[in-house]
A protein has these predicted regions:
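Short cysteine-rich loop/turn motifs with clustered Cys
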Residues: 80-112, 138
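Domain-exit/linker segments immediately C-terminal to small folded modules
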Residues: 132-228
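N-terminal accessory alpha/beta regions
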Residues: 1-75
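Short Cys/His-rich Zn2+-coordinating modules
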Residues: 65-80, 116-123
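Histidine-centered nuclease catalytic patch
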Residues: 99-133, 147-160, 167
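Short, flexible, mixed-charge glycine/proline-rich loop motifs
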Residues: 76-88, 126-131
Length: 228
C-alpha cells in the first residue's frame, strides 16, 4: 500500500512530509485529476526551492524511493494498452500524425507509444505514478528536442488548460487548420499541382493553444509531412 510506504518514509525523513500538498495522500495521487496534480506539483516545487541544496537532495531521494516509476513503468504501460480498462490509443495525442496504437504480438500486446509525463517527474517525483499525468505520445513529441522535460505552459492555469488529460482540453476544436499561398501571385486553385507554393497555418479560437503548436513544432511538422 503506497500510503504505508509514504508513512514509513516520512518517519525517517520529516522534510518529505512537508512537501505534500495538505489534504493529499500518496494513494490519492494515483488517480487524482490533473488540475489537482498541477497544484501538488507547484506546491512541491515551491517547497523544495526554499530548501538548501543538501536538504533538497534528501527530499528528492526520499520522494523517489516512494514513487518508483521504474518499478511500475511496465505495469502502467500494460494497464494503458489493455482495452478492458477503457483506453483507446491510436495516434500520438500531441501531434495526431504518428500511429502509436498497440498491436497483438505472439504472446502479448506490443506497445508503440511512450508514456510522457505531462508534469516532469524528475522535478516532482510525487506525480511520477499518477494516471492523469500520462499521455500516450510518439518518441518525437516526447523527445528532448520537443516536449522532453519542458512544461506545456507558463502558468498554473495554462498547464491545466493545455494538458490532454484535463477535461477542459479542446485543442482539436479550438485550433483550425488553414492552407494559405506563400506568395501573392499563387493561384488558390492549384494546391495539388504545386503544394510547395502553400503552407499550413493555424487559426486560434483560443490563443493559449499556440503554445502547444510552438512546443511541438506542429506548423513545421505538418508542412514538412503534407506539403513538401
Amino acid at each position: 500500500d503506497l500510503d504505508n510506504v509514504w508513512k514509513n518514509k516520512v518517519t525517517s525523513c520529516q522534510l518529505l512530509n512537508a512537501a505534500m500538498l495538505p489534504g493529499m495522500t500518496a494513494k490519492k495521487l494515483l488517480v487524482a485529476e490533473f488540475r489537482v496534480l498541477v497544484n501538488v506539483y507547484h506546491y512541491y516545487i515551491n517547497y523544495v526551492n526554499g530548501l538548501s541544496d543538501y536538504d533538497k537532495r534528501i527530499v528528492q531521494d526520499a520522494a523517489n524511493d516512494v514513487f518508483k516509476y521504474e518499478s511500475y513503468s511496465k505495469r502502467i504501460a500494460d494497464f494503458l494498452i489493455n482495452p478492458s480498462n477503457g483506453y483507446k490509443i491510436s495516434n500520438c495525442v500531441y501531434c495526431d500524425t504518428v500511429n502509436v496504437s498497440p498491436f497483438p504480438g505472439h504472446k502479448r500486446r506490443i506497445r508503440r507509444f511512450q508514456t510522457d509525463h505531462v508534469l516532469n517527474r524528475g522535478a516532482c517525483p510525487l506525480v511520477a505514478l499518477s494516471l492523469h499525468n500520462f499521455v500516450p505520445s510518439c518518441n518525437i513529441c516526447n523527445g528532448a528536442n520537443l516536449k522532453g522535460t519542458n512544461t506545456i505552459g507558463d502558468t498554473i492555469e495554462e498547464i491545466k488548460h493545455l494538458s490532454p488529460t484535463n477535461p477542459s482540453y479542446n485543442f482539436w476544436h479550438k485550433v483550425l487548420f488553414v492552407v494559405n499561398p506563400k506568395y501573392s501571385w499563387v493561384s488558390d486553385n492549384k494546391k495539388s499541382e504545386h503544394p510547395e507554393h502553400y503552407e499550413i497555418d493555424f487559426y486560434y479560437k483560443d490563443k493559449v493553444y499556440a503554445k502547444s503548436v510552438d512546443l511541438f513544432c506542429l506548423k513545421e511538422k505538418y508542412n514538412n509531412d503534407y506539403l513538401n
